Amino acid sequence: MKILIPTAKELNLTAPSAIPNPPLAQTQAVLDELATMSVAGLASFYKISPERAEIELQAIQALREGTAQHAPALYLFDGLMYRHIKRQDYTKEESQYIEKYLAITSALYGVIPALEPIAPHRLDFMMPLKLDGKSLKAFWKEAYDQALAEDEVIFSLLSSEFETVFSKKIRQRMIGFKFLEDRGDKLKVHSTISKKARGEFLTALITNQVTEVEQMKKLNFAGFTYRPDLSSEQEMVYVKEV
């Protein structure tokens, strides 16, 4: 079993530092390709100012040289979903659950354990980087599939941007989740609701040590409850009345 969550654009640059593991060959290849760009090229690629592109180029060089600051991924990312995940005061059982089951999908690092030390970076799968003539998604597909080859059940809190990196064979094992608000006359979904709910849902999984679908159906978190009438075998739907 694995639980997958995506990276986030927002970062907590004060997260506690950690010693990194040696980078994957794919990570090194991506960094080498990024390092071929000029400051102007990086500014255009990332759609940022030349001043920020200069800082980004220095960060890429530090990563290649092994001098970049690293922090556990779960603490480094600080988007809306992450801010709604319990990330401190873990019990021993909660820490073991995270280490065993939770993984983060990255366009630079691949599929990594949630507490893997990584460096701040901007790269995502929507960016038009080519490696050996392949898109980032195509470049990472084999490594992504290998990372989950032994997992029969995969709980995905990913967007389609990340899910489509995996082959169809792997995606068929995934169970996805949808979070809706019931406003009386209609069910509503938008990114803010979804991101907050994903974090709250993951917290419920961690604190309740959930490993099976039947356990998930019984969860009640942040006002959300499971709705079997809206769910399917590959998508579980939770609704909050507001």
From Swiss-Prot:
<protein>
    <recommendedName>
        <fullName>UPF0246 protein SSA_1395</fullName>
    </recommendedName>
</protein>
<dbReference type="InterPro" id="IPR005583">
    <property type="entry name" value="YaaA"/>
</dbReference>
<comment type="similarity">
    <text>Belongs to the UPF0246 family.</text>
</comment>
<dbReference type="GO" id="GO:0033194">
    <property type="term" value="P:response to hydroperoxide"/>
</dbReference>
<dbReference type="GO" id="GO:0005829">
    <property type="term" value="C:cytosol"/>
</dbReference>
<dbReference type="Pfam" id="PF03883">
    <property type="entry name" value="H2O2_YaaD"/>
</dbReference>
